[in-house]
């Protein structure tokens, strides 16, 4: 299956997909598909959204359009991509085509966005809510009335945070260890360099995952950890440890520049500021402040508390202030 933009010349293929599953259209409009639905899907976008921000993507197997995704980039804000719909051809439903199309969408979006957002109409929730939950989306709690001609229902918003990394980063060989992360352009002090997202697991689950490295993780709470995706592995996961890093934490998932970073500088964080108590690692970072060993108990060190102030993940900061 491959994903690409649907062109106006392919409106007939899009219309055939829409008409293959009339129940979908009926659940969200109250009417069966109309002859111009495909053309409308290609054209419609929220008022004020520029034309280039809307993309209608097709997931294809050969010449067959298997699924369609309506995507709004930078809506409702510049850090969000909004999924208007994901509809699967009737003949391909129940075969994993929707999940496969969604995975292709995440690859297409890359690391440009902080979160994905979508709306589920209650009249379609039985079919849609479970699917989106399995893809990692969670309800935001925002609920609004929904009206389409005679159909009256309710819309519930769902979101999924995604790992975002500064565009001025690249992976290459590191003098610290293996591959590292390097700046390709200047990054100013206080500028956000990455926001992490992934799957939340318990300590017991994490121990099992760590038996099959690499596993990129940070601690969220005493028994809750965030495991980053590994296929593909996000760019920020290649960031090495330093005992005098140029990044530090400003909340549970966000890293910002500790000082001005020049092109060519290696991007680092202090693993001791974001790990659980079981963690232990020999350090060869080369910094004049290298402590030789990094552990999950480093939050107790007075010199680190003074150096980083409040720039620890919340789970460790709570212990420091406890």
Protein language model regions, located:
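Catalytic cores of histone-lysine modification enzymes
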Residues: 164-247
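Conserved beta-strand-loop-alpha-helix junction that forms the acyl-donor binding cleft
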Residues: 118-129, 146-151
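C-terminal SET catalytic tail plus cysteine-rich post-SET Zn-binding segment of SAM-dependent SET-domain
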Residues: 241-322
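Active-site acidic-Proline motif in GNAT/NAT acetyltransferases
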Residues: 89-91, 95, 123-124
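Acetyl-CoA-dependent GNAT
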Residues: 5-91, 102-104, 108
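Conserved GNAT acetyl-CoA-binding A-motif
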Residues: 109-121
């Amino acid at each position: 299956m491959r994903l690409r933009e649907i062109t106006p010349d392919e409106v007939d293929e899009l219309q055939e997909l829409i008409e293959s599953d009339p129940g979908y259209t009926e659940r969200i409009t109250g009417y069966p598909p109309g002859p111009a639905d495909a053309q409308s899907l290609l054209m419609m976008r929220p008022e004020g959204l520029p034309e280039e921000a809307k993309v209608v993507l097709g997931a294809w197997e050969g010449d067959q359009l298997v699924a369609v995704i309506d995507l709004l980039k930078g809506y409702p804000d510049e850090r969000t991509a909004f999924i208007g719909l994901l509809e699967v051809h009737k003949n391909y439903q129940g075969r994993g085509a929707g999940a496969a199309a969604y995975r292709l969408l995440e690859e297409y979006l890359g690391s440009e966005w902080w979160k994905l957002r979508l709306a589920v109409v209650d009249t379609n929730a039985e079919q849609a809510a479970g699917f989106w939950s399995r893809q990692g989306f969670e309800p935001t709690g925002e609920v609004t009335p929904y009206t389409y001609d005679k159909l009256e229902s309710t819309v519930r918003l769902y979101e999924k945070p995604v790992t975002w990394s500064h565009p001025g980063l690249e992976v290459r060989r590191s003098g610290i260890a293996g591959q590292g992360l390097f700046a390709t352009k200047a990054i100013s002090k206080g500028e956000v360099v990455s926001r992490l997202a992934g799957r939340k697991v318990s300590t017991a689950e994490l121990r099992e995952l760590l038996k099959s490295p690499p596993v990129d993780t940070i601690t969220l709470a005493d028994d809750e950890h965030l495991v980053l995706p590994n296929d593909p592995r996000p760019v920020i996961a290649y960031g090495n440890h330093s005992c005098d890093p140029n990044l530090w934490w400003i909340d549970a998932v966000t890293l910002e520049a500790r000082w001005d970073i020049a092109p060519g500088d290696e991007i680092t964080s202090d693993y001791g500021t974001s790990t659980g108590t079981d963690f232990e690692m020999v350090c060869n970072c080369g910094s004049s402040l290298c402590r030789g060993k990094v552990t999950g108990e480093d939050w107790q060190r007075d010199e680190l508390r003074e150096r980083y102030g409040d720039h620890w993940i919340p789970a460790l900061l709570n212990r420091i202030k406890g």
